[in-house]
Structure formats: structure tokens, C-alpha cells
């Protein structure tokens, strides 16, 4: 009889069983394989090929789920080339079609309801069918493989977890508030004992370290602070300690102050470590956004939107005003102008712009950031996604952000009227090139102005130079000159180039004033003409009324004459 081979994939490896083909013709297959003894009597293990690692298991199972024949499965099926008229039971019909297309195999793939019953029995009694395989090992391997397969289907990557960004930036803000509170409390507390040190040492971390190393003020002169402070500041502190006006404190007070100083030092070091961690995570999750707006602003945008995907789905107009919702709704309610920027205002590119150009640069930056966000959120830079042997490097991932930032910088320099820099030159937050550090120079300090002091006794006041005021020409005189002959105009035009720029500007201003005066005079003349016309119109009805009265009187006289004639 022709044999029947059963292909089963497990979390441990690929298994090939051999059985009689009559097994498929039985009606009570499900009842026969319910027990381990029954299924062991029907099936015999032909070959078991283990997975070398979890990555190999994921790759093999993923290809089987997609209905593809992997190289490992092909090598397993090569052992069945010599079998004639044999059948192969598979769980997936799609996989059976792919196996049927393999060259050199004469196997007939089978996948129906009876084979499903057989596979169900194999899964239930797998430890008894494969010697040396414990149930605990199978459950552990199945759990790990299922998680890996789920991540593969979702294309999940631990480097893409933006929840870490949201938590890190929130914790960073909280740390800043706590550090400011603790540092202020340390300075106020230790200031009772050594108040002069607060004016000399401005850095909170250095202040706390000095407290931990010096302790009481009397120990300042004998303590070496070279590893904490520069030499000149150390000298100033030691000199101030000799003449300090602070009060004395007990050892218990100092112990509590030192405990608080240790908190300041610990929080400061942790904040630095958290800041570097946040920068690394932002570079891994959103490299293009980081290049455009920076790691802190980018992290705040992601935290405000909730996730990287939500931010990538937002249009550029939303990204531009993200963080200014109160101002936006207030403007919409009062029908005023809407805000031009929100959190993006703190980006270095917007800070380089001045005045009215801030809104333009914020709009351009938001548009480029929207494109970069979609690349960061939706692109698959892994080796598996790209089909390459190695992962894509950081420069290639952030190439879009670098080129977009360079375009915005060039556009900004054009708007500001600054000379365009050659490509590849870095620009600092102040808008200047940072390719080469400038030479440090000592500038002259502002000197004391003794003339600004008050005068005592009969001391003479300092002489103040008085500027001579030049007499401006009157408007009437300019008007007369403008109405002169053409010969005078030609003479003036010949003289203008010989005068300085200031005199030419004054002449232009005087001419403009004359034009304004002429326009005003013309307007007044028009008004006077209109007033005369209105007066004539008001006199016209009176003249017409007198004419009518005269005609009426003449008519009455003629009627009286006619009556007299009729009487006669």
C-alpha cells in the first residue's frame, strides 16, 4: 500500500510522521487518536528537524503561515523523493499547492476534514510522539514563538516604542521643577551660615558639591576645591569665608543640609543621564523630526499628540499650533487672529527668525516636520523590511530632515537679507555659521561718566556741545521756487548733483511738502467753488418768486381794465 506522510510544524521544529493510507478511509479516526496509545500505534516518527534558534523558528513558521516553502522545509522533503505514489497530509491547502509545485517530488498533498482530526490528535499528544520532548518545554517554546509571531505580524519593533519618549519628557519636566526647588532651599538654608558663597557660585551642582566637601565655613581655607571650581572662584570663596557675616550652625543642621545637597547632586546627575537617554531614543524613533526641531521640542510634540502615529497623522497646520489650543479657541471665540505657533516656537530655526519672519519659518518648519514624521512613523528601516543584510545607518535615516533643515536655513537667510552660506556649513542658534570657532577677544568695559554726577558748591558744569539748527525753508518760498521759469529749474538740476546727499534729501522733502500744500490749496478752492454754487442755487428760487408775483399783478390789472370797459 502507498504510504501516508504527515507534515507537522511545532514550536520546537518540523516533524514528519509516517502512517498507513488506510487511516484516512476509517470513519472512527477521531476516536482512535483520542489516547496516546492509540495515536502511537497509528503514527511513526520518520524525521524531526529542530530549530536552531528563536529567530530561525520565527522565520520558518512565518513562511509556513504565508504558504511558502522555506529552505529548511525543502531539505526535509528531499528525503521523500524516492517515494512513489505517496501522499502528504498538510494542515494548510495553500502550503500543499506550493509543495506540489516543487520539482522532483511525486507526493500528492492532502488537506481535508480527516487530516484536521489527525493534526488535532498530534497536537494533543505531541510529547508522547517525540521522544525527549517535555510538555513544559513545548509550552515555553510555544509561548515565545507566539509572541514573536505576533510582533512580526504587527511589524513591532522595541525601538519604535514612543511611550518611553512620553514618560521621559514628562519626568524631565518634573525633575527640573524639583531641582529648582531643592537648589533654592539649599542656598537659603546654607546661606544663613555662608551667605557670600551664593553670590560667587551660581551653578546649583557646584554649590551642592562645595557644601558636601567643605561642610562648616571654617574648613574652607584648608579644603582643596580644584576639582569642583576654577582657581579664581576658589580663591574668591576662601577670601569671602575669612570675613563672612553668616551665623554659626550646629552639626545636626549641617547634616540635614548635606542630605539635601546630596539629593541635588543625585537629581542633577540623573537628569543628565535622562536627557542623554531621551536624545538617543528620539534619534532612534524620529530622526527626521529630531533634525528639524530638536529632541526636546520633538519629544514634547509627541507627548502632546499622545503617540508618534497620532502626530504623523496630523496635518502641518495642526503641528504648527500644537500646544496653543487655549489661544486658538480664544481667538476663534473673539474673532481675532489665530496664533501662528505653539510648541514649535521653541525650535532653534524659529528662534533665529526675527519679527514677522517667525510666522513664515514656523509654517515652513511645520510642513517639513509633517513630511519627516510620516517617514519616521511609517518607514521600515530594519534589515528585514529593506531586504538587505545590514540595517540602515543613522545618516541615511535622517537624510530627509537634514536636507529640509538646510533648505529652511537658506530661505531664512534670504528673508533676513543675510549672505547665503555654502552647503554643508552648520548654523548655530544665533543664525551664524559654527564651522570654525571664533577668536576670543577681551572687549573694553564701559567707563564711568563723571559728567553725569551732581555738582557740589560753585563747581562749573561740564560744557555740552550745542548743535546748530539749520533753518528750513518755508512752504511758501518752496512753492514760489517751484513756479519759477524753466531756466531756474535747469540751474537747480545742475546744482543738485554737486550738493551732498543730505541737501538732496532735504530738497526732496521740501518739494513733497510743497506738493501737499498745493493739493490742500486746490481742495480749498474746490470747496469754495462748491459753496458759491450752492449759494447761487439758494438765491435762484427767490428771483423766480418775484417774477411770478409781477406776472400775477399784471394779470390782475388787465382784468380790472376789462371790467371797467364792460361797465361803460
UniProtKB/Swiss-Prot annotation:
One Pfam family linked to the record: NOP5NT
GO molecular function: snoRNA binding; snRNA binding
Any one Gene Ontology BP term: endonucleolytic cleavage in 5'-ETS of tricistronic rRNA transcript (SSU-rRNA, 5.8S rRNA, LSU-rRNA)
SMART domains cross-referenced by the UniProt entry: NOSIC (SM00931)
Domain of life: Eukaryota
UniProt entry tagged with the keyword Oxidoreductase: no
Biased composition (Acidic residues): 477-491
Major location (coarse): nucleus
Entry-linked PROSITE patterns: NOP
Nop domain segment(s): 285-417
GO cellular component: box C/D methylation guide snoRNP complex; nucleolus; small-subunit processome
Transmembrane intervals: none
Subcellular location: Nucleus, Nucleolus
Keyword presence, Ribonucleoprotein: yes
Chain segments carrying region Disordered: 451-568
Biased composition (Basic and acidic residues): 492-540
Keywords: Nucleus, Ribonucleoprotein, Ribosome biogenesis, rRNA processing
Function: Required for pre-18S rRNA processing. May bind microtubules.
Family classification: Belongs to the NOP5/NOP56 family.
Protein name from the UniProt record: Nucleolar protein 58
Species for this entry: Botryotinia fuckeliana (strain B05.10) (Noble rot fungus)
Amino acid at each position: 500500500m502507498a504510504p501516508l506522510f504527515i507534515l507537522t510544524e511545532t514550536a520546537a521544529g518540523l516533524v514528519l510522521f509516517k502512517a498507513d493510507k488506510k487511516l484516512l478511509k476509517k470513519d472512527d479516526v477521531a476516536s482512535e487518536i483520542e489516547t496516546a496509545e492509540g495515536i502511537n500505534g497509528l503514527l511513526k516518527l520518520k524525521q524531526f528537524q529542530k530549530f536552531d534558534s528563536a529567530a530561525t523558528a520565527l522565520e520558518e513558521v512565518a513562511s509556513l503561515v504565508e504558504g511558502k516553502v522555506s529552505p529548511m522545509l525543502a531539505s526535509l522533503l528531499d528525503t521523500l523523493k524516492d517515494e512513489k505514489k505517496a501522499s502528504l497530509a498538510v494542515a494548510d491547502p495553500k502550503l500543499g499547492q506550493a509543495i506540489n509545485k516543487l520539482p522532483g517530488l511525486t507526493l500528492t498533498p492532502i488537506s481535508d476534514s480527516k487530516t484536521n482530526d489527525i493534526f488535532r490528535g498530534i497536537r494533543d499528544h505531541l510529547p508522547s510522539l517525540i521522544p525527549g520532548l517535555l510538555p513544559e518545554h513545548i509550552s515555553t517554546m510555544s509561548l515565545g514563538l507566539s509572541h514573536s509571531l505576533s510582533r512580526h505580524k504587527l511589524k513591532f519593533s522595541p525601538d519604535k516604542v514612543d511611550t518611553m519618549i512620553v514618560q521621559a519628557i514628562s519626568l524631565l519636566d518634573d525633575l527640573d521643577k524639583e531641582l529648582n526647588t531643592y537648589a533654592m532651599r539649599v542656598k537659603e538654608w546654607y546661606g544663613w551660615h555662608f551667605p557670600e558663597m551664593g553670590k560667587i557660585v551660581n551653578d546649583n551642582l557646584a554649590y551642592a558639591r562645595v557644601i558636601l566637601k567643605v561642610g562648616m565655613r571654617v574648613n574652607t581655607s584648608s579644603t582643596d576645591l580644584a576639582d569642583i571650581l576654577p582657581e579664581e572662584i576658589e580663591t574668591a570663596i576662601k577670601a569671602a569665608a575669612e570675613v563672612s557675616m553668616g551665623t554659626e550652625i550646629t552639626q545636626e543642621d549641617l547634616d540635614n543640609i548635606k542630605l539635601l545637597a546630596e539629593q541635588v547632586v543625585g537629581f542633577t546627575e540623573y537628569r543628565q543621564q535622562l536627557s542623554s537617554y531621551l536624545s538617543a531614543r528620539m534619534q532612534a524613533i524620529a530622526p527626521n523630526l529630531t533634525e528639524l526641531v530638536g529632541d526636546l521640542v520633538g519629544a514634547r510634540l509627541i507627548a502632546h499628540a499622545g503617540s508618534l502615529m497620532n502626530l504623523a497623522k496630523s496635518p502641518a497646520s495642526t503641528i504648527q499650533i500644537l500646544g496653543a489650543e487655549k489661544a486658538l479657541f480664544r481667538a476663534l471665540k473673539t474673532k481675532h487672529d489665530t496664533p501662528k505657533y505653539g510648541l514649535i516656537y521653541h525650535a532653534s530655526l524659529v528662534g533665529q527668525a526675527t519679527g514677522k519672519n517667525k510666522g513664515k519659518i514656523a509654517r515652513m518648519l511645520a510642513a517639513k516636520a509633517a513630511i519627516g514624521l510620516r517617514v519616521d512613523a511609517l518607514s521600515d528601516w530594519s534589515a528585514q523590511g529593506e531586504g538587505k543584510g545590514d540595517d540602515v545607518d543613522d545618516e541615511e535615516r535622517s537624510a530627509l530632515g537634514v536636507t529640509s533643515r538646510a533648505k529652511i536655513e537658506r530661505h531664512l537667510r534670504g528673508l533676513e537679507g543675510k549672505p547665503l552660506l555654502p552647503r554643508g556649513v552648520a548654523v548655530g542658534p544665533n543664525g551664524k555659521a559654527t564651522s570654525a570657532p571664533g577668536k576670543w577677544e577681551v572687549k573694553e568695559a564701559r567707563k564711568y561718566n563723571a559728567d553725569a554726577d551732581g555738582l557740589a558748591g560753585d563747581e562749573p558744569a561740564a560744557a555740552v556741545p550745542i548743535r546748530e539748527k539749520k533753518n528750513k525753508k518755508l512752504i511758501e518760498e518752496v512753492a514760489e521756487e517751484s513756479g519759477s521759469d524753466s531756466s531756474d529749474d535747469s540751474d537747480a538740476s545742475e546744482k543738485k548733483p554737486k550738493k551732498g546727499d543730505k541737501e538732496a534729501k532735504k530738497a526732496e522733502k521740501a518739494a513733497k511738502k510743497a506738493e501737499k500744500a498745493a493739493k490742500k490749496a486746490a481742495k480749498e478752492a474746490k470747496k469754495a467753488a462748491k459753496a458759491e454754487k450752492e449759494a447761487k442755487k439758494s438765491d435762484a428760487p427767490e428771483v423766480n418768486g418775484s417774477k411770478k408775483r409781477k406776472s400775477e399783478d399784471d394779470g390782475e390789472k388787465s382784468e380790472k381794465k376789462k371790467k371797467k370797459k364792460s361797465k361803460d
